[in-house]
Regions:
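Domain-level signal for soluble alpha/beta catalytic cores
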Residues: 1-245
Length: 245
């Protein structure tokens, strides 16, 4: 148990001035590759703030989604093509994800009809607060299998999941008939370097359940825990493994 100070919602949530477009532009100016921007999703935000205004997480999430939608439209107008809304809470509370979380996730992308825009969501299962820690809570192992069909039926183009820190029963990948899957193959909170052979083997495991054209190789999540040099080593091996296919 712990105590912490949280921002508190005391009135209706509305979008104000843009907060991500300039950040995306500055980073995009450093490369000729299309950069992805990430935004926390409404259901995950509701779990990390206090609330004295809304009568339910669902209704709070609706207004949060509308505010996020305004920012996403600004990003699209600025030229951003890859927009990811992070919803790790879907793995913690899959029933809520099914009841209203996925609906509010779709609401974030309302009226985004440009076919060149990739609508992405990231759903990881929890990590430690320091590198190489092993005793930390994870989301239930069956979470992905509970929400995979609903995600495939949604407007989301690509779903990002973790698999390196804890191997999944990959049967749920069969549920993705049209959705692409960003498949986590590199641990982001472990200093152990995955071998090329290990990554290739796990890709082959996944390809038993999903088409190659739908599978995207990636780390489990962000690389903030890893020292820069170690992160580069892990990514280099991951790319070498991916290029084997």
């Amino acid at each position: 148990n712990y105590k912490c100070w949280l921002p508190t919602i005391t009135s209706k949530v509305k979008a104000k001035e843009s907060f991500l477009v300039e950040e995306w532009k500055k980073n995009q100016s450093l490369t000729n590759k299309d950069l992805k921007i990430t935004i926390p999703g409404p259901m995950t935000i509701t779990d990390t703030i206090a609330n004295t205004f809304y009568d339910s997480d669902e209704h709070m999430g609706e207004d949060l989604a509308d505010a996020i939608n305004v920012e996403i439209k600004r990003l699209v107008d600025a030229g951003c093509k890859y927009i990811q809304v992070d919803e790790p809470l879907f793995a913690r509370k899959p029933e809520n994800a099914l009841n209203f979380g996925i609906k509010n996730l779709e609401r974030c992308f309302k009226d985004i009809n440009n076919q060149s825009i990739e609508k992405i969501t990231h759903i990881c299962c929890g990590y430690p607060d320091k590198l190489d820690a092993v005793d930390y809570p994870k989301a239930p192992l069956d979470s992905y299998s509970k929400i995979s069909k609903a995600l495939d039926e949604s407007i989301i183009d690509t779903v990002s999941i973790e698999d390196a820190h804890r191997y999944n029963d990959l049967n749920f990948l069969k549920d993705f008939k049209q959705t692409k899957v960003i498949f986590g193959l590199v641990k982001i909170a472990s200093s152990q370097v995955e071998s090329k052979e290990e990554i290739v083997s796990r890709i082959n495991d996944a390809l038993k359940f999903i088409d190659k054209e739908q599978l995207i190789v990636a780390p489990d999540c962000g690389l903030g825990h890893l020292p820069r040099d170690l992160a580069k080593i892990k990514l280099k091996i991951m790319v070498e493994a991916s290029n084997s296919f």
